[in-house]
């Protein structure tokens, strides 16, 4: 992953789609410490779901899409996050914690070249931005992001097509990598892990993450 590219199956993470417009933006700004009104379409931000004392319930990535927002949640927290957000938003919006989509990450200095050979145009994405692309006539949402400290991409793809995509990436020279190695990579990069470096007893300020507020 440091020298070439590695593929990680991170489908255990939550993919939460919340559908809505300007009213949704106002409501989410009451929940997340972000300026979502000025977040550009198809751009992403790192943020937190916090309790009333600013304790971190989860850290997450929120992306503005045409339909509303796509929020990537930690696996151990996703069901509780969904419940909390449903209550806070008073069930005003359609919310889907999508179990029908896999999440495949390809990371490393060769990831852009390899993924672009399979899905044309992804190399033009900037860091922390994304868009819808087609793979085998299926809509996939790809962001230029990751959890390794390397250049890379995360691909939200229908479950039935995740295996085919992975095999094509392997055919182009990438290799499968386990989540234990991913944890080592994020440690080397100084990235936080919820449940270890972050928890509900810490605020973002106490966790030295003021830059994300």
For the regions a language model picked out, list residue spans one by one.
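Basic, glycine/lysine-rich polyanion-binding surfaces/domains
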Residues: 1-213
């Amino acid at each position: 992953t440091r020298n070439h590219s590695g593929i990680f199956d991170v489908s255990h993470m939550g993919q939460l789609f919340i559908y809505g417009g300007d009213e949704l933006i106002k409501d989410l700004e009451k929940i997340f410490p972000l300026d979502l009104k000025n977040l550009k379409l198809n751009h992403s931000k790192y943020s937190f779901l916090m309790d009333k004392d600013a304790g971190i319930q989860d850290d997450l990535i929120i992306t503005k899409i045409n339909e509303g927002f796509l929020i990537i949640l930690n696996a151990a927290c996703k069901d509780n996050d969904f419940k909390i957000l449903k209550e806070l938003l008073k069930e005003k919006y359609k919310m889907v914690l999508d179990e029908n989509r896999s999440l495949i990450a390809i990371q490393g200095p060769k990831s852009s070249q390899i993924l672009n050979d399979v899905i044309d145009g992804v190399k033009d994405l900037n860091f922390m931005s994304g868009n819808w692309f087609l793979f085998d006539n299926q809509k996939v949402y790809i962001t230029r992001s990751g959890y390794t400290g390397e250049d890379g991409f995360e691909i939200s793809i229908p479950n039935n097509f995740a295996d085919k995509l992975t095999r094509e990436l392997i055919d182009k020279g990438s290799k499968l990598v386990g989540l234990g190695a991913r944890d080592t990579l994020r440690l080397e990069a100084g990235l936080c892990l919820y449940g270890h470096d972050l928890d509900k007893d810490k605020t973002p300020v106490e966790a030295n993450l003021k830059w994300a507020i």
